Amino acid sequence: MSIEWLSEKLSEQGIELSNTQKEQFQKYYKLLVEWNKKMNLTSITDEHDVYLKHFYDSIAPSFYYDFNGQLSLCDIGAGAGFPSIPLKIVYPELKVTIVDSLNKRIQFLNHLAAELGLEDVSFVHDRAETYGKGVYRESYDIVTARAVARLTVLSELCLPLVNKGGQFLALKSSKGKEELQEATFAINILGGNVKETYTFELPENAGERQMIIIDKRRQTSKKYPRKPGTPNKSPLVES
């Protein structure tokens, strides 16, 4: 059973899943596959692959970063809830907000949270560029993003939401360090400073992952993020 595989792999890292948490992951998989038939949530639907490439992959950052405590976490472009919902299941005290530009995905997440009995979660239908200009600007302890865009673009979408003293966790594939070289200029302009990069392999040769931890040292200038679409079309790079 894939849930037993996940439980065993997490146990090796010192994370013990309760029966309730195991049931939540099993329900999550079931709902993901059901809803995926009517909307495009994921191309990965095989049970073991979901447990490995979505659930385990989402939780792996916690092997290197402490998510314990009542931390506020904003997840940008989480799609079907990765990485923040698996993290919320394992660390129930997290206060999670997911921002996604597609309303259908927000509907799925609302249904998912209700079915899993998750508290302190909210789902916002908005563009990150707009959300980063609003009342929640510079209000989160942690902002995460996984497989959304290149790091230069992600930095402009995510760093404005991080409070001073908080951190942006960029979850990347094997190209993270390469993207980081390009993104250093943008990170600095936006008030960030690269703290650390962790590189690790998923089990079963499922790929290399990198987690880049960026400290928020200074407030972000009010001109960022720029209007929707601009960060992607004209990334902040040194001219």
UniProtKB/Swiss-Prot annotation:
Entry's Gene Ontology cellular component terms: cytosol
Location of the protein in the cell: Cytoplasm
Keyword Methyltransferase attributed: yes
Record's keyword terms, sorted: Cytoplasm, Methyltransferase, rRNA processing, S-adenosyl-L-methionine, Transferase
Enzyme nomenclature, EC number: 2.1.1.-
UniProt key word Protease: no
Region Disordered, residue ranges: 217-239
InterPro entries documented for this protein: rRNA_ssu_MeTfrase_G, SAM-dependent_MTases_sf
Gene Ontology MF term list: rRNA (guanine-N7-)-methyltransferase activity
CDD domains on file: AdoMet_MTases (cd02440)
Binding site for S-adenosyl-L-methionine: G77, F82, A128, E129, R146
Pfam families: GidB (PF02527)
Stated family: Belongs to the methyltransferase superfamily. RNA methyltransferase RsmG family.
Xref: NCBIfam families: rsmG_gidB
Task performed by this protein: Specifically methylates the N7 position of guanine in position 535 of 16S rRNA.
Protein name: Ribosomal RNA small subunit methyltransferase G
